[in-house]
Amino acid sequence: MSETAMAQDNMPMVEKTVCAEECRAGNFAAADDDAVAGKKQFTLEDLNFGGKRYREMSPKTLRLWWKENTLVNADTLAKPKGYPQVYSRDHNIFLQTAVGSEPQQITADGSRQIQYGEAVHRNEFGIMNGIFLSNSKQSFAFYRMDQSMVTDYPQVNTSGRVATLEPDAYPMAGMKSHKVTIGIYNITTQTTSWLDLGDVTDRYFTNITWSADDKEIYLFEVNRDQTDMSLDVYDVASGKKVRTIYREHDDKYVEPLHPVSFLPWDSSKFIMWSQKDGYTHLYLMSTDGKMIRQLTKGEFVVLDLLGFCKKTKSVIISSNEIHPLQSNLYAVKIQNGRRTLLDNGKGVHYGILSDDGTHLIDTYSTPDIPRAYDITNTVTLKRTEHFRSPDPWQGYAVPTYKMGSIKAADGVTDLYYRMVLPPDFDAQKKYPTVVYVYGGPHAHNVQASWHWYSRSWETYMAQKGYVLFILDNRGSENRGKDFEQVTFRHLGQEEMRDQMCGVDFLKTLPYVDAERLGVHGWSYGGYMTISLMTNYPDVFKVGVAGGPVIDWKWYEVMYGERYMDTPEQNPEGYAQTSLLRQAKNLKGKLQIIIGMNDPTVVPQHALQFLDACIEAGTQPDFFVYPGQGHNMAGHKSVHLHERITQYFEDYLK
């Protein structure tokens, strides 16, 4: 029985059944040609984030914030910058204590190899920054990362008169990783001390939090194998570890992503995140290590913790309890875990709490609403409509966006897809169809927001007469631990099986031309694109793979070893998932696109695949963006997506 205050049967649900059946039967009504005629056409300058008109073609955004408990628009009153300001520049830490004061340099030996105050462990484990200000703002903790033992990847800067070497420290799977220590700087005494972590070789430290009284530091430690994690407490004054609050083991992997959150009315208790019951949930813990209760439970995941309402003694969260494609806001009673829905039960919601947690800015969208803002009283549950963004695409020939579900390759699990149809769609015609894929962990492509979360490039392609199909396979996020971990030690294999279930579904639709199937993806999606092109060479006619992983032994330590173990521990898995041996199977037209200075999926991947194709006598196409990283910045993104589009226009249409 659900503990949610509002009965689930009465909650608005995603309207999936009808459209799913329509998709299976191909029962899409033909577009009204007269309605489409005379409508304006999109360009990539309208749709792409690097386009000149992208902002005016996006739903209107309000910059709202709370000044204590008063709602303020940043266009009227800018949010003031808090002090002290602590930041990292040129790998050193700087401190500015007041407006107009001279910044003080706190560290002096920062370099490419020794970095202070920056995100470590390659931004894994939820690490987004490297400086952590105390509650009193009298001290801050910071990371120090030593990369001197890490192998360099030789990136080259070709922008000058003579090209120069600008290497990246890049720890590949199974190789030496960097070492991280944690410092504490006291602003008042201007002194630095260090946590006594011992030998930090092959240890990861994440989710740093100050205790409510600033006397202790809480952090999670993860071993190199990423099978064990502990929540440890360090005394700030001595730097010594004083206790371990919690331990967790998983035979596949653990992945702490969130710091603990102390109750503002009782600093002896805090909330911890864990997937130990199979889904991401919240647990109420005491500072002496006792688990008081599991606050949330069920076959759904908690997505965010926004803060607390002191008046109702509740924690405010978002979760996908109503439907896997939704994100809704709840107040959860600390005393008993009882959940109360705070929004309209539809779509995807994000919240910003007032200082005391009694009011909430609820920003949301649904498949039919571009963006909206409600103000919610978390105590009385009264919702007030604040703003509705007009449709920025009014007057344009807009495609049809549909959502449905199919079964995964296991025959049991529901997988959700989005389909995008041309504005002038005619069910009696046959359309070239492109499968857009990502497929990897920590991402999803389908959700119940505007146009079912469609990417703007899909709109552009549909306008040109293509059907687009996007499926979230097993291994993607927000569906629970088993759903994600099915890919462990053999990345890409179950994902391909699920994507081919999607292809089988497409082949049942009378308007999909099975002889003109294409596939496109970037990063993990680039890996999936080449995997599908070479494992199913008679299915896909054209593919465009951006920034593709080719062999996981060339990918970085933290991510690669979490999902694949090391090449020494899992030689069969690395051999099975490498695309080098698949180069000989390439039959269709494949374009590979990379940034020449990609620090995430280094160019070695694509270059080695090209070499394998040369040896095998197969003929992929290749395009490189000089000086660009894993994604193309600014207006170069418009050029990129025009190039991707043209490749399908040349060889699929």
Predicted regions, residues:
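Serine-hydrolase catalytic core recognition
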Residues: 152, 214, 350-653
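Beta-propeller folds
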Residues: 5-342, 346-350, 358-359, 367-369
